[in-house]
Each structure stands twice: as structure tokens, then as C-alpha cells.
UniProtKB/Swiss-Prot annotation:
Gene: rpoB
Class of enzymatic activity (EC top level): transferase
Function noted in UniProt: DNA-dependent RNA polymerase catalyzes the transcription of DNA into RNA using the four ribonucleoside triphosphates as substrates.
Record protein name field: DNA-directed RNA polymerase subunit beta
GO MF annotation list: DNA binding; DNA-directed RNA polymerase activity; ribonucleoside binding
Length: 1370
């Protein structure tokens, strides 16, 4: 049984002190889960939940015609089989998609208009093809037209209600104006806002504002009802014109002053003197002595507002209306008419203002009908309003699910903000919602309370792939719905079938547009595995329904306290998108409502538990949360009396018993990229940002090496990115080579199963960024592998760990000015040993079309091309694999027919003599573009169905078939062997009941005991003759085993035949294309001057010189350093992490060399163990080394020679004392410095130099991709100057400043040449060419074309510019 040492492949010494609580969730889970929930592809139709596609179909169907005579109902949807697998789609330029079929039911009714009823006349059900939907690959990407794309998740403002104010910026007085906004997922926005006069207005869809009371009246509320809802009322008992009494209401009277002395009813003593403040105690005393009314002067009532209509019950007449102000005459009339009591609105007091009453006074609309018509008139000014139309329009605005959808999230936010308990599936507005929103806003204004923060992650949510596509699909279905309704009306429905009504084109078009051109559908960044993973975990605030770069301010872009553990504060692009495009943190996940959650350990009674809760930003705001590095004892109790914690994002010191939660890990704060940077805690944030961004640009190298100094999550990134191959089941490796691994699976009960897993390795495939994707097996024949084990490395992975660069020996010192301004001095050894060499793959494509003049042909027979140029082409005209090519070489020979041109008499004569017909085609071969040099690694040919295949196609087809045959053979052999094993186990010690023979050959004699060897030699065709003496049950079991075997064999064969059939069928090509050839060229790029390199701490630079190894500074033992960096690049950048990495890297290298030496010298195991125990902690030593055999340890020698691997987790890394101890263990100076000698003179440098091992990356900005040279090339049409840029094969611009330098040197003729014949003097160019041919090198400059352009521009401005030609001699 292999030990953990061989199983894990790589042991890392971990400097972290904090134990792992939970595993990091799968890094691309968000993408995959979202799309699975959208499709619900593997869920039976009756069990599908109301979300994604199901919800869209249910919300649009049933579709009824305008008269109600027919209805089209949705029954279910299903997916068909995928036509092409992922690899085929990538090769052929197809989309990886599955057809969608829907079952719909057309119900036709008989309508009885008089009775108002309808009865079913006819029901027709039919399955209809409904276009296709792209499927997601296992790695969370989509393949659209042969390219891998990623749908980036969008971070947008959550639907719901938000309260805000203008911070005093709107009005000149600086008064704070409060506002509220109800945002639905779909439908009209509702804005409530105060003006400077405290009148409350409302806007619908940002149109003209009108008083909020108009809307409330349209909802059916009366004036009196509204006033009593917003204001408390108090009863007044009128005695006379001079004296009255008011009811004792503690809620209203609290804090007011006594109008007169208040006397005890029995004793007559003064309880409360006049003008004394009425507090809680005073009011309670009054109630205790039985005082229910307080005396007041009637004159105090003047100016107060009535809460109800005042009615003279004698006559039934309304004396005064609700909301009227009382004046002296009115008061007199009340007394005269004998009105005993009135109710007044309480408008003055704490947190109460008359703003709503003032709004009502301003509002001239009195009835609900008027209000509805007023709203209709405001929103539809051009349409004539009628009450019926206005009512329907108003109801559709907020109360019709077809037009308005708050979404579950919107309802959730509304319930939380307004304190409601409405079910989440109630997704339109209610009357109460609007009323309560108005009341909440008025309360907020009166109390000057806090408003919502729109940048809080509780108010922003993530829309992942599923939801984005769901919204698009709905748009397509709504377009289709209109067309269906029109068809139902125009045609006789009885005669129609469902397929006559449904046309899926609008839906397909919307889906195609979304995947092809949406801002959120992006070409995947596939430079290396990390760039893939970060692209899938990216969140963008841009895109449809989001922000735009120009409008986004600082607040949206800034880091917010709620980002903690949810969004990385470091990883974001530099430039205009900073802060708008962010990355999900390591442990973060998105909940069903789209809010980002982060995990916390629960804390009970000041001790941390092992179980974890996921909290959103809204959930965590009231809890104190401790940090992951808070000191705990073995039982999880806090050691300190005051613990550093966060409450609502603010740092505080809290006693342990108050803490409710604790972070799970120090790196939960940052994203995957940032958590790959060791000693991140010692880097300045700006440099950490560059470091995490530049790791994504690292090019995969030929020889991958994991970093000596890592952080411990390299393995997780490699596994989750999908570039490394992970074993699907436990099993034994039966066969392994560079292109495939065959594993025989072991059943769960430990028995050898008959299952076979064949893993095909990707060999030298081109990525989106032209880097090379190549997989290498890590297992050997006979190895036992467990489920989830990494069995093959991909690009930029080393033994299942992410490996973006190389560990190199660096020195921080200046060297001859070659590391000025971040330049990097590199040793020649790096080029010789291919340390930073990478392979880049270019794809070239040529298409033969059927043109109007005839068919283009791919052929070796090309006019006017010598045999030398054709030497590498095969008989089909396609270059052979392995050929070395240079610019302008022919890759694929192609000729195109050209139109018959008028022949000269000479040509006619030649034609007549030689009968030559070759000149009617022209050479349009695919040639190598400038700047590309490399080796052909593959050529793929696609021919249209029905076109005869050429030799090359047949050869490629034969190779593919033989590969498939090999797979089939292996699979059948494993099934055969495992069946034999099962039979042998069943027939152990059993005796054959009869002889089995084939002709004269006897396989088993009668009475012979069965053995595995006998059964292996027995052909499977004779297995049904196996019989056992005395045991009929065994025969039954044999029958079952045989049936199982035949079934598996049949399955394998049918799959194989299907694949071969697919191969032999012609290819689907675009219209007019006969044949398409793709040629792949591998270009090997060594590190050279001008290439950009970087460390992981934002320390980037350009290679300035490659120096012979013997000239590089060297150690006292003669070892030269590999790279010399500028020490001035550290202090001002404040990325000290690189220095600590260098120190610990040096120690790791030294210790590794010591261990390798000890193993080579075969030291005693005791000594070896002591050394290992000093380096590794108890757990690591116990797990990996304690039980390892001598052979296993010796197998680590090559690894140890490069150094031992260490992990310094983010925010929990190695401390200074540990680094010092590590350096002294390695036997080097604790200062991390060494004396270096100058390679040129052999003299030591004056001072010791900081040296060590740093992990360096080669970035994608390669000089070969940027540099080019132009001799003769294309010119711009208008100015006739050479084009610019490498893509256009342009020249360098000689601009204004360059002209000044030439003038300064007085180089007039050189300058004249630059500005005329070498640039845009067309006639002069031609003359110059002729002169050079004749051997005359004199210059005769003419008029530059740009001067003519200037003249034409001036003429366009109506200036009459003419050139006056002077005659010579005047």
C-alpha cells in the first residue's frame, strides 16, 4: 500500500499556526451551480422547481388570443442529444450546445358571449423544436463558434427599497432633502422625494414629479383616512368660546407644557404649575388621581387642524371639513351650533412635522377617479384619457405580474426595510407597501435618521450566468408571444397545429446575441490556469443594467467594510475599470438570492466551535466578529481578556463572552490570486494588486517547477481549474503513455470492477492566448490511485500544484547600470538550460470556397512557384507535420480561378502552340506571416459532405480510427479480465460438469477444477457452456455475469461504431465552403532582451542584458547567481515580501541540498529523522516521513536537490525568528546576505549582498510579439503614408519631435528624404525606385501627399487655396 508520501507527491513545510476549519469550496462552483439551476437538465420535468428556464416558460405561457377563443399552454421542456463533443467543437469551430424541445398544448374554446362562459372544443398537444442552448463544459466555460468564452457574473444594485438623501448638495440653503426609491427587477421605478419646502413628491420612471397624495388617492385612500394614518389625533371638549378641555393622552402630551395650573379634583391642591413640562411621572400622577381631561383656553384652538369632518347632528350639515384650519369664526360657529367635541391633528411635536398635511393642501385632486386620470395624463401626455383606460394603465404599472416583478429578493428587502411579513412569492407591490414606504420616509426625515448605503454588499447582489441568460430568454419569449397572438388572431385557430403558431427564431437570436456579443460574455483569458480561474470568479459592475465607466464615482469603486471575506480588496484592474471589476474572495459563495456570503466559526460562551455559519452582509452587522488569528487554547477558548473584533466593519476590543463569530481562515479576506502571494502581509496594497494581476499573465513554461516558497493553496488552484486530470474513481493504472491513461476501477466494496476509465491527455493544444496546453502523466503502470487524486499535470502545474514560473537564485545589487529603472540582468545559463523557455502555438486557417468564377482548389500544383518552395508540401498541398517554417513559406497551396482577361497577341500565340491553360488561376496560398518561425505540429482538414477526400484527410482519418480501435481493445480486454476474475472467484474449487472443446482443442476436461488460468484461455464465446457439478445456483450466477459482460461489450462496441460513423461523415462547413484546413505552428521562445519578467510581489522589470554565466557575480563556492535585481526597487515600492521570500527561499534550497546529500551518502535513518523533525512539524513528519521506506525517501533526492518546499500562508506566515532559525538550519548567514565575487575581476564586492531564491515569472508581454521590421509595405489611402502597428506591417512614425532633432543636426537632405520619398511623395517613390534600378542614387523630391490633403481640407472649409507655379528664370 503506498504511503502518504508517494500519494501526495509533494510535501510542504507549513509555517501556518492556524488549523484548517473548513476546506476552500470548489473555486468555479458559482458558475456551474448557477447554470445547472437554470437548465435543470438532469431533473425530471415533473420535479423541476420554479426557477430558470422552467420559470421563464411558466411566466410567459399560457398565451391567449385577444378574443379568448384559444390558448397555447406550456407542458414541459426537454433537451436532445449533443451533436458534437467539446473537443470536436473546438476543432471545427462549432458551438457546444444541445437542442431544446418543448411540449405545448393548443386549447380551442367555444365562447358564449351572452352567458359570458366558454367551453373546451379541441385540445392539440405537440412537441416542437425550440432552437438550441449552449451547454457549459466541466470547467465552467462555453464554447461558442469554436472559442472558449466565460460569462462574467454581474454585481448590480439589488431590487427593493432604498432610502437616501442628497447630503445638502441640491439646494443652495444646504438643506438635506430625503428621498426613497422602490426598484423592481422588471417594471416601473418609483421615486419619492422631498423638495426644499418639505412637500413630498413622487416620480414614476423618472418622469415629471407630482404630489405623493395623488398616487395615494389613486390607490383608493381618502383624505381623512390618510391624515389619521400619518398623524395622531387628540379629542377636544368645547365648553365655551373662552374655555375648553383636552383629553389626557400621554403619547401626545409627553414633553409639552401645562397650559394652566392643574388642581387635585378632591383637595384642590396644585399638582402641576402652569408652563411646567409634562414628563412621564407627572402624567402618571395625573392619571392616578383620576384626571382624564386637562383645562385649556379655547383661543389655543385657533390655527389647529381638524382630523375629522365636524357635523351638526341637528341638521346633518357639515360645518367644517377634515384638514381645515380653525379660525375665530369657525370656533364661534361650533359653540353656537352646540358642537360638544372635535378631533384635532397633532402636527407639532418631536419627530412630527406638517409636511404630509402641506402636501395634501397643495394637491388639487379630490377623488380616486381624478387621481387616476391625472397620473395617466402625466405618463401618457399624448393619449386622450378615459377612466377605464387610466385604471387599467395604473393597475398594470405596479400590480400586474406580467408588467411588474419585484423578484423574491426585492420582496425580501421590502419586508426587511418596512417590517412586513409578506410571502416571498408575492412579487408585485401592494397598496400597503407604498403607504408604509411613504410613512417610513416621512419618519426618516422628521427624525433625521440614517439612510441606506448603496455600496453595502447587503444592497448589491450577484447575477450569475443562469440569471443573466434567464432574463435574455424572457425577452426572446415575450417577442415570440406577440407574434403568436397576431397569428392566432389572423388565422383560423381550429385548423392550426401548435407548430404553425410557434417560431423559435426570436428566442434563438437573443441567445446567440447574448453569448456572442454581450459585454459580459468574454473571450476566456487562458494564459495559465490561474487566469482561467480568476476570470470565472470575476464580478463586474459594468454591462447591461449595470454602471458605465464614465458614470461610476469613487464610492462605488472603493473598498467597503462589507467586502470583508466576500470581495477581494486587492485584486482589481489598474486603469479605468479599477474597483468596477472585482474578484470573489477565497471562501465566499453566493446564496440563492444572489447575496455574497462568507463563513464564520460559531463562538459559544467565549469558546470557538468547529461548525461554521455562512453570513451575508445584512446578517453580520450586529455581531462582534473576532479575527482568525485571535489566540485560542487547545479547547478553542480565547486566551486574552479583550479580543480584537469587528462590529459593522469597525475595529473594536471586546470581552470574549460578547463574541458570537470568528473568521475561519486568515486568507478568507483575499481572492485566489492574492492568496498565492507569500508574505502578502508585508507588501504595500498597490504592489500586491500588481502582483496578483501579473500572476495571471505568466506564460506556461516547458519545464514547470512549483514555488519553493508557496502559500499552501497551489494544489487547490491546480485541481479546481480543470487543467490537471483528476481520477474519477479509485482504481489501478492498467496502461499509461503520453497521450492516455487507462484505469481499471475498483468497486466501493473493494472488489475489482469491470469499469474502465480512459483519460485522454491533451497534447500541445493552442489556448485562447496562443500559449500551449499540454498534459503529462504523473502515474505509472500498476499504481493504485484514489478518487480525486491528480493523475496528470497540465500547463503550469507541477505534481498537481500550480507552477507559474521558476525558482532562481537572485542577488539584490547594482551591476554596471544594467538594472537601472527596474531592468533585470540575467545569466546566460537561463537560456542554455531552457529555464524560462515557453512554447507558443499559432493557428493558421485557409478556406477553399465555391466562387462565381469556379471552385478554389487546395493543391500542390501552384503556378509560378519553384520546387524548392513546395518541398515540405505533401501531394494534397498541405505542409507535412514536423517541417520547420520561416516567414513567407507556403503552409497550404491554394489556387483561385481568375476572370478571363483580354489576351495579348503574344499570349494568344503561346496558347495556340503549347495549349497552356494554367494561367487562368492565381496563387492564393496560405503563407507564413512575418515574424513567425517554428515547427508544424498538426494539420486538420475538414471537407464538405459529398466532396471526395484527399490523401491527407484519409491519413488523418486512419490515424484517428486506429486510436479509437486501441481504446476499444483496451476497454474490452479490461472487461474480459475483470469478468474472468469474477468467474474465477465464483468457481473457486468447483469442478466442471462437462468438457468444453472447440473441434479437437480441449479447453476444460470433465471433472477438472476451475482456475483463473484455465478461464483466461477459454474464449468468451464458450462461457455459456460452463456448468458446475452439484450446484445449480452457480449456473444462475454465471448466467448473470455473462449477461452483464455481453451488455458492457455491446455498449462499448456501439459507442465505438458511432464515433467511427461520425468520423467518416463529412463535416458541416459554412455555406459556400468546400474545404477548410487548419495548420498549427509551435514557436519556441527563449528568454531574451526585452521580455518582461516579474516576481509575485508586483516587482516587474524588463530583461536588459543576458550575460555569460562566468561574468555573473558568484558565491564563495563558485556558484554564479542567475538574476541580478536592483535593490532600489524595494524601499520606495514597500513590497518587502520579496526580500523575506528571498531569505526563506535560500534557506529552503540549502536545507534541501543537505537532505539530498544525506540521502546520497546513506546516512543512518536516526540522523535523517532528527534532521527531518527539526524542519517539519510533528504532523507533517508523522504523516509523510515516519513510515516512509528507504526507497521512497531516496526517490525524493531530485526534489530535495532543488530545495524543500515550504508554505507561508497569507496573514499567517513565517515570522522573523522562524526565518532566522531556518537560515541557520541551512547553514547560511542569518542576515540573509553573502559575500559575492565579481565574475569579471574575481574580486569580492565591497559589502555583503542580499541573495536567495525567488520565484520569477515570464509574462505574456514578449518582445517577439511586439518587434517587427518593415521594408516595403502598405500605405494609407488618404495620406499615402505608411500604416502603423505590427498587425498592419506598418512603419515607425517620424513625428514632429524627431523632425526637430534632424533640424538640430542640420541634416537637411536626410530629413527631406524622410519626409518625401520614404513617406508620402507618390511620384517621387516611383522615380526613386527606377533610379535605384538604373544605379543612380540621387534624390529628386516632389510634393508630399499630406500637403495635398491639407490643401483639400482648407478647400473643404471654403478657402480657395491654389498653388501658383512660378516659371523658371523670372
Amino acid at each position: 500500500m503506498p504511503t502518504a508520501l508517494t500519494h501526495e507527491y509533494r510535501v510542504r513545510k507549513n509555517f501556518g499556526k492556524i488549523h484548517k476549519i473548513i476546506d476552500i469550496p470548489n473555486l468555479i462552483q458559482m458558475q456551474k451551480e448557477s447554470y445547472e439551476l437554470f437548465l435543470q437538465r438532469d431533473v425530471p420535468s415533473e420535479a423541476r422547481s420554479e426557477r430558470g428556464l422552467q420559470e421563464v416558460f411558466k411566466s410567459v405561457f399560457p398565451i391567449e388570443d385577444f378574443s379568448g377563443t384559444a390558448s397555447l399552454e406550456f407542458v414541459q421542456y426537454s433537451f436532445g442529444e449533443v451533436k458534437y463533443e467539446v473537443e470536436e467543437c473546438l476543432a471545427r469551430g462549432m458551438t457546444y450546445e444541445a437542442p431544446v424541445k418543448i411540449v405545448v398544448r393548443l386549447v380551442v374554446y367555444d365562447v358564449d358571449k351572452e352567458a359570458g362562459t366558454r367551453s373546451i372544443r379541441d385540445i392539440k398537444e405537440q412537441e416542437i423544436y425550440f432552437g438550441t442552448l449552449p451547454l457549459m463544459t466541466d470547467n465552467g466555460t462555453f464554447i461558442i463558434n469554436g472559442t472558449e468564452r466565460v460569462i462574467v457574473s454581474q454585481l448590480h444594485r439589488s431590487p427593493g427599497i432604498f432610502f437616501d438623501h442628497d447630503r445638502g448638495k441640491t439646494h443652495s440653503s444646504g438643506k438635506i432633502l430625503y428621498s426613497a426609491r422602490i426598484i423592481p427587477l422588471r417594471g416601473s421605478w418609483l421615486d419619492l422625494e422631498f423638495d426644499p419646502k418639505d412637500i413630498l413628491y413622487i416620480r414614476i420612471d423618472r418622469r415629471r414629479k407630482f404630489p405623493v397624495t395623488v398616487l395615494l388617492k389613486a390607490l383608493g385612500y381618502a383624505t381623512e383616512e390618510l391624515l389619521n394614518y400619518f398623524y395622531p389625533s387628540e379629542k377636544i371638549f368645547l365648553k365655551s368660546e373662552a374655555q375648553s378641555e383636552k383629553e389626557l393622552n400621554p403619547d401626545i402630551l409627553m414633553g409639552s407644557r401645562a397650559p394652566e395650573d392643574i388642581l387635585h379634583p378632591q383637595t384642590g391642591e396644585v399638582l402641576i404649575k402652569k408652563n411646567r413640562k409634562l414628563g412621564k411621572q407627572a402624567l402618571r400622577r395625573l392619571q392616578e388621581v383620576g384626571i382624564n381631561r386637562l383645562p385649556m383656553k379655547s383661543t389655543e384652538l385657533i390655527g389647529q387642524v381638524l382630523a375629522q369632518d365636524v357635523i351638526d347632528y341637528g341638521t346633518g350639515e357639515i360645518v367644517a371639513e377634515c384638514n381645515d384650519s380653525i379660525d375665530a369664526d369657525m370656533l364661534k360657529e361650533f359653540v353656537e351650533r352646540g358642537v360638544g367635541e372635535i378631533e384635532l391633528l397633532h402636527l407639532e411635536g418631536q419627530d412630527v412635522s406638517p409636511s404630509f398635511r402641506n402636501t395634501l393642501l397643495m394637491d388639487k385632486v379630490n377623488t380616486q377617479e381624478d387621481a387616476l386620470i391625472e397620473i395617466y395624463r402625466r405618463l401618457r401626455p399624448s393619449n386622450p384619457p378615459t377612466l377605464e383606460v387610466a385604471t387599467e394603465f395604473f393597475n398594470n404599472l405596479f400590480f400586474n405580474p406580467d408588467h411588474y416583478d419585484l423578484s423574491e429578493v426585492g420582496r425580501l428587502k421590502l419586508n426587511l426595510q418596512l417590517g412586513l411579513e409578506v410571502p416571498l412569492d408575492y412579487r408585485t407591490l401592494r397598496k400597503d407597501d407604498i403607504l408604509m414606504a411613504v410613512r417610513q420616509l416621512i419618519r426618516l426625515k422628521d427624525s433625521q435618521g440614517p439612510v441606506d448605503d448603496i455600496d453595502n454588499l447587503g444592497n448589491r447582489r450577484v447575477r450569475a450566468v443562469g440569471e443573466l441568460l434567464e432574463n435574455q430568454y424572457r425577452i426572446g419569449l415575450v417577442r415570440m408571444e406577440r407574434a403568436i397572438k397576431e397569428r392566432m388572431t389572423l388565422q383560423e385557430v381550429e385548423a392550426l397545429m401548435p407548430h404553425d403558431l410557434i417560431n423559435a427564431k426570436p428566442v434563438s437570436a437573443v441567445v446567440k446575441e447574448f453569448f456572442g456579443t454581450s459585454q459580459l460574455s468574454q473571450f476566456m483569458d487562458q494564459t495559465n490556469p490561474l487566469s482561467e480561474i480568476t476570470h470565472k470568479r470575476r464580478l463586474s459592475a459594468l454591462g447591461p443594467g449595470g454602471l458605465t465607466r464614465e458614470r461610476a464615482g469613487f464610492e462605488v469603486r472603493d473598498v467597503h467594510p462589507t467586502h470583508y471575506g466576500r470581495i477581494c480588496p486587492i485584486e482589481t484592474p489598474e486603469g479605468p475599470n479599477i474597483g468596477l471589476i472585482v474578484s470573489l474572495s477565497t471562501y465566499a459563495r453566493v446564496n440563492p438570492y444572489g447575496f455574497i456570503e462568507t463563513p464564520y466559526r460559531k463562538v459559544d460562551g467565549s469558546s470557538a466551535r468547529k461548525d461554521v455559519s455562512y453570513l451575508t452582509a445584512m446578517d453580520e452587522k450586529e455581531y462582534p466578529i473576532a479575527q482568525a488569528n485571535a489566540p485560542l487554547d487547545e479547547k478553542g477558548r480565547f486566551l486574552l481578556d479583550l479580543v480584537s473584533a469587528r462590529v459593522a466593519g469597525e475595529p473594536v476590543m471586546v470581552p470574549p463572552n460578547e463574541i458570537r463569530y470568528m473568521d475561519v481562515s486568515p486568507n478568507q479576506l483575499v481572492s485566489v490570486s492574492a492568496s498565492l502571494i507569500p508574505f502578502l502581509e508585508h507588501d504595500d496594497a498597490n504592489r500586491a494588486l500588481m502582483g496578483s494581476n501579473m500572476q495571471r499573465q505568466a506564460v506556461p513554461l516547458i519545464q514547470t517547477r512549483a514555488p519553493l516558497v508557496g502559500t499552501g493553496i497551489e494544489r487547490i488552484v491546480a485541481k479546481d481549474s480543470g487543467v490537471a486530470i483528476v481520477a474519477r474513481r479509485t482504481g489501478v493504472v492498467e496502461y499509461v503513455d503520453a497521450t492516455r491513461i487507462v484505469i481499471r476501477a475498483i468497486e466501493d466494496n473493494g472488489e475489482m470492477g469491470s469499469g474502465v476509465d480512459i483519460y485522454k491527455l491533451i497534447k500541445f493544444q493552442r489556448s485562447n492566448q496562443n500559449t500551449c496546453i499540454n498534459q503529462k502523466p504523473l502515474v505509472q503502470h500498476g499504481d493504485l490511485v484514489t478518487k480525486g487524486q491528480i493523475i496528470a499535470d497540465g500547463p503550469s502545474t507541477d505534481h498537481g500544484e500550480l507552477a507559474l514560473g521558476r525558482n532562481v537564485m537572485v542577488a539584490f545589487m547594482s551591476w554596471g547600470g544594467y538594472n537601472f529603472e527596474d531592468s533585470i540582468l540575467v545569466s546566460e545559463r537561463i537560456g542554455k538550460e531552457d529555464v524560462f523557455t515557453s512554447i507558443h502555438i499559432e493557428e493558421f486557417e485557409v478556406v477553399a470556397r465555391d466562387t462565381k468564377l469556379g471552385k478554389e482548389d487546395i493543391t500542390r500544383d501552384i503556378p509560378n512557384v519553384g520546387e524548392e518552395a513546395l518541398k515540405n508540401l505533401d501531394e494534397s498541398g498541405i505542409i507535412r507535420v514536423g517541417a520547420y517554417i520561416k516567414p513567407n513559406d507556403i503552409l497550404v497551396g491554394k489556387v483561385t480561378p481568375k476572370g478571363e482577361s483580354q489576351l495579348t497577341p503574344e499570349e494568344k500565340l503561346l496558347r495556340a502552340i503549347f495549349g497552356e491553360k494554367a494561367s487562368d488561376v492565381k496563387d492564393t496560398s496560405l503563407r507564413v506571416p512575418p515574424g513567425v518561425e517554428g515547427i508544424i505540429i498538426d494539420a486538420k482538414v475538414f471537407s464538405r459532405k459529398g466532396v471526395e477526400k484527399d490523401e491527407r484527410t484519409k491519413t488523418i482519418e486512419d490515424q484517428e480510427i486506429s486510436r479509437l480501435m486501441k481504446d476499444q481493445r483496451d476497454e474490452l480486454e479490461i472487461i474480459f479480465k475483470s469478468t474472468v476474475k469474477r468467474l474465477a472467484k465464483l468457481l473457486e474449487n468447483q469442478v466442471s460438469d462437462s468438457a468444453i472443446k472447440d473441434g479437437k482443442k480441449v479447453y476444460i476436461k470433465k471433472g477438472e477444477v476451475f482456475t483463473e488460468e484455465i478461464l483466461l484461455n477459454l474464449p468468451s464465446g464458450h462461457w455459456d457452456q460452463l456448468t458446475v457439478a452439484k450446484d445449480p445456483t452457480v449456473s444462475m450466477e454465471i448466467e448473470n455475469i455473462l449477461a452483464n459482460y455481453r451488455e458492457q461489450v455491446q455498449l462499448v462496441k456501439s459507442l465505438f461504431e458511432e464515433k467511427i460513423g461520425k468520423l467518416k461523415r463529412g463535416d458541416e462547413l459554412p455555406p459556400g465552403v468546400i474545404k477548410m484546413v487548419k495548420v498549427y505552428v509551435a514557436v519556441k521562445r527563449k528568454l531574451q532582451v526585452g521580455d518582461k519578467m516579474a516576481g509575485r510581489h508586483g516587482n516587474k522589470g524588463v530583461v536588459s542584458r543576458i550575460l555569460p554565466a562566468e561574468d555573473m557575480p558568484y558565491f564563495p563556492d563558485g556558484t554564479p547567481v542567475d538574476i541580478v535585481l536592483n535593490p532600489l526597487g524595494v524601499p520606495s515600492r514597500m513590497n518587502v515580501g520579496q526580500v523575506l521570500e528571498t531569505h526563506i527561499g535560500w534557506a529552503a534550497k540549502g536545507i534541501g541540498m543537505q537532505l539530498a546529500q544525506m540521502l546520497e551518502e546513506c546516512r543512518e535513518r536516526e540522523t535523517m529523522n532528527e534532521k527531518l523533525q527539526r524542519i517539519y512539524n510533528k504532523l507533517e513528519f508523522g504523516t509523510y516521513f515516519k513510515d516512509a521506506s528507504e526507497r521512497e525517501l531516496r526517490g525524493l533526492i531530485p526534489d530535495f536537490k532543488e530545495g524543500i518546499h515550504v508554505a507561508s500562508p497569507v496573514f499567517d506566515g513565517a515570522e522573523e525568528a522562524e526565518i532566522r532559525a531556518f537560515l541557520s538550519e541551512a547553514g547560511v548567514s542569518e542576515t540573509g546576505q553573502s559575500v559575492l565575487y565579481d565574475g569579471r575581476t574575481g574580486m569580492p564586492f565591497d559589502q555583503p549582498v542580499t541573495v536567495g531564491v525567488m520565484y520569477m515569472l515570464k509574462l505574456h508581454h514578449l518582445v517577439d510579439d511586439k518587434i517587427h521590421a518593415r521594408s516595403i509595405g502598405p500605405y494609407s489611402l488618404v495620406t499615402q503614408q505608411p500604416l502603423g502597428g505590427k498587425a498592419q506591417f506598418g512603419g515607425q512614425r517620424l513625428g514632429e519631435m524627431e523632425v526637430w532633432t534632424m533640424e538640430a543636426y542640420g541634416a537637411a537632405y536626410a530629413l527631406q528624404e524622410f519626409l518625401t520619398v520614404k513617406s508620402d511623395d507618390v511620384a517621387g517613390r516611383t522615380r526613386m525606385y527606377e533610379k535605384i534600378v538604373k544605379g543612380d542614387n540621387t534624390l529628386e523630391a516632389g510634393l508630399p501627399e499630406s500637403f495635398n490633403v491639407l490643401v483639400k481640407e482648407l478647400q473643404a472649409l471654403a478657402l480657395d487655396v491654389r498653388l501658383l507655379e512660378e516659371e523658371e528664370g523670372n
